[in-house]
Amino acid sequence: DCEFVVQSAVLHDIGIGQTRSLGLGCTGNLPYVCHGVEGRAILDRLGLERHGLVCERHVGVGISARQTVQRKLPLPVRDMIPLSVEERLICYADKFFSKTDDGRHEKTIDEITAGLARYEAEYADRFLSLHRMFSREPDHQEQGRSGWER
């Protein structure tokens, strides 16, 4: 659904204003990791529930209930992993540019996976699964598990 992807791409970070990310000009009170859940709440109130799920599920490469508990994240304990192809596409595309460098540097696959692996190897596996799904290039870092079955 191309129209939905475009709309969701514009809206997926709407919750960032509720977070405290001074480097991004955000003076809210919540940790940055909460921007997806906050975005979902905003869009749900506007009747845009499907778009809200994109907000909630794009953070990192999705966050499972297990990871929320294990890492003591200030998030609801539920799986927030992208499920639809549209959710997965926005999650994938979101990893290539950072808000902190004014979007001037497109990250490589290696940079993205290294950054995600700092948090948990499963995150890098999930990203590589997305890369296989959306890339036309052969996967240069074939990994065993897809990362989606957890």
What are these regions (language model features)?
Residues R104-R126:
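C-terminal/domain-terminus segments
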